[in-house]
């Protein structure tokens, strides 16, 4: 989807980048659908390398959130690296932004556009589900709704990037953003 041909966004634009997976992108699935990668260029880093300016407010928020989630989700503090959340790049649950009106409004005032990243991961031993997988989670729906509301009020576009392994229900929310991009599992450079 690319309403009013808003894509590509103008290089040098200041972007508010929402979504935990924007800063910890998913390069591949699990089991044989995983890729052995020397490094991963996350969506946030890829946008910077392409000449966009990422809002430091959103970046700081999600970097702290992702670190906290890794601590909560790791099986035990002294587990081997290959068992850690950071090694497997799990999709952490999105934070509930329903009470983050001031944060989102500040970003809408300060930035030229918003990019919201949604992610899914699947593969051997981790089949997908209908609830909170094919369908968005309540937190993801809230994030899209709040970001679209704030940025559209300022006359600014919103792009949703889907870093996913398969189909995701879009009919219930696709009218909200100005553009939807399917990134799929891009390999090591998102």
Task: Report each predicted region and the residues it spans.
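C-terminal non-catalytic regions of proteins with extracellular/luminal or membrane-system context
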Residues: 1-190
């Amino acid at each position: 989807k690319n309403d009013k041909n808003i894509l590509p966004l103008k290089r040098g634009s200041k972007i508010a980048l929402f979504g935990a997976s924007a800063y910890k992108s998913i390069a591949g699935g699990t089991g044989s659908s995983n890729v052995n990668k020397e490094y991963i260029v996350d969506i946030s880093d890829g946008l910077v390398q392409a000449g966009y300016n990422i809002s430091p407010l959103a970046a700081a928020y999600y970097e702290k959130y992702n670190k906290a989630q890794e601590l909560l989700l790791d099986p035990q503090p002294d587990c081997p690296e290959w068992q850690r959340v950071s090694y497997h790049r799990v999709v952490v649950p999105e934070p509930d932004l329903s009470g983050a009106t001031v944060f989102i409004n500040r970003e809408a005032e300060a930035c030229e556009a918003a990019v919201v990243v949604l992610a899914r991961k699947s593969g051997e031993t981790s089949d997908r589900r209908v609830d909170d997988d094919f369908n968005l989670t309540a937190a993801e729906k809230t994030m899209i709704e709040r970001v679209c509301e704030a940025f559209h009020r300022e006359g600014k576009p919103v792009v949703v990037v889907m870093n996913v392994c398969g189909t995701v229900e879009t009919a219930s929310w696709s009218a909200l953003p100005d553009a939807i991009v399917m990134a799929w599992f891009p390999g090591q450079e998102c």
